[in-house]
A protein has these predicted regions:
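A structural preference for short, hydrophobic beta-strand core positions in alpha/beta folds
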Residues: 10, 56, 106, 167-168
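Phosphate/ribose-recognition catalytic cores of enzymes acting on nucleotide-derived substrates
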Residues: 212-325
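Residue-level signal for inorganic ion chemistry
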Residues: 33, 92, 135, 195, ...
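Glycine-rich, Lys/Arg-enriched anion-binding loops that position phosphate/diphosphate groups
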Residues: 150, 158-258
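N-terminal catalytic cores of NTP/NDP-binding nucleotidyl/phosphoryl-transfer enzymes
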Residues: 14-81
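Short acidic-hydrophobic, aromatic-tinged amphipathic segments that line or gate anion-handling sites
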Residues: 4-14, 105
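N-terminal Rossmann-like or analogous alpha/beta NTP/dinucleotide-binding catalytic cores
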Residues: 65-139, 143-161
């Protein structure tokens, strides 16, 4: 069996013999929510039963991103992803042993893969390249050009080539099927608690701390500027948050995520003001967990007006933090 640490493989060309003959699960896995975790748990148990390795196969970009590459979707929150590639890697690596795959395989979703038929996908990728022994999929799994492949087709070819196929029923909460789109909608509509329940953890965004324009420092509220590897996010506004840092641990604060209309921001940015904290964190990789929505973004006529509002926002965030203790 391979080492328990997650190994990331970028492309089939980097797969070696030791990556073959395993158990695989396939999908977008955007958010790695409770439904995804059921699939990972099943994959892990099947790999243990067969005494082989487990592999999660996913795609970059996500197929829906590939098929909606025009500019009309770039500012649409409904088209935003829940997690970046780096966040997906980090989340999987942090999962407990019963959920964490041995390998994470990224396939580049391009014209070639988009045009591959379901049968070609099975024979060329699953059989010839990976020589899989078992595959775990969700009950709504579709694959191949025009999404013509389904569980029945996969099972038929499993019988032909000697691999087993298992389907996992959707995970439901209050009679609603947990899905990435449902979580995205909850976040857009300020239902953080509902989103967190479906994720099984607080919604979190990770990134490096960059040097910003330091406007916050001039009004008494220095901020950490988190580099976002995305043009859109399901969250917009001001939130109470917790910053997670390997060096500094957990630090409470308040965050604004959006386009900063007071300074005519052109792109989505995440800025975090940390309470009772004056350490330098430039260049660090941090994760920001969102707890409560404070308010929507708004444009202020002056920086004095912005400063007064931030003071009120901090008071509210601290009050929420105190109530949670």
């Amino acid at each position: 069996m391979p080492d328990q640490k997650l190994q990331v493989i970028r492309g089939l060309n980097n797969c070696r013999q030791q990556h073959q003959n395993g158990v695989i699960t396939i999908g977008n896995f955007d958010g790695l929510h409770l439904g995804h975790q059921k699939m990972l748990e099943k994959m892990h148990s099947e790999a243990s039963r067969l005494n082989t390795q487990s592999c999660l196969m996913t795609f970059e970009p996500l197929p829906r991103e590939y098929f909606s590459r025009d500019d009309s979707q770039k500012d649409n929150p409904d088209s935003s992803r829940l997690m970046s590639r780096i966040e997906k890697i980090r989340t999987l690596a942090d999962f407990e042993d019963s959920l964490r795959p041995d390998y994470l395989l990224f396939l580049k979703f391009d014209r070639s893969l988009a045009g591959m038929s379901a049968v070609e996908f099975i024979e060329q990728i699953l059989v010839e390249s990976l020589k899989i022994r078992a595959v775990i999929v969700g009950d709504d799994f579709r694959f191949g050009c025009d999404r013509k492949g389904d569980f029945d087709l996969l099972s038929d070819y499993g019988d032909k080539y000697g691999f087993s196929v298992s389907s996992i029923e959707s995970h439901c909460i209050d009679d609603h099927r947990v899905s990435s789109s449902l979580i995205r909608g909850a976040l857009i509509n300020d239902q953080l608690e509902r989103a967190d329940t479906m994720l099984g953890r607080p919604y979190t965004i990770c990134g490096h701390v960059n040097h910003g324009d330091k406007r916050g420092r001039t009004i008494g509220f220095p901020t950490a500027n988190i580099h976002l590897r995305r043009t859109q996010t399901p969250l917009h506004g001001v939130y109470s948050v917790t910053m997670h840092s390997l060096k500094h641990g957990d630090v409470a604060g308040i965050a604004n995520i959006g386009r900063r209309p007071t300074v005519d921001g052109a792109r989505v940015q995440l800025e975090v003001h940390l309470f009772d904290f004056d350490e330098s964190i430039y260049g660090e990789q941090v994760c920001i967990s969102f707890q409560h929505k404070i308010r929507d973004e708004k444009k202020f006529e002056s920086f004095d007006g912005l400063k007064q509002q931030i003071q009120l926002d901090c008071q509210k965030a601290l009050g929420l933090l105190k109530n949670e203790r």
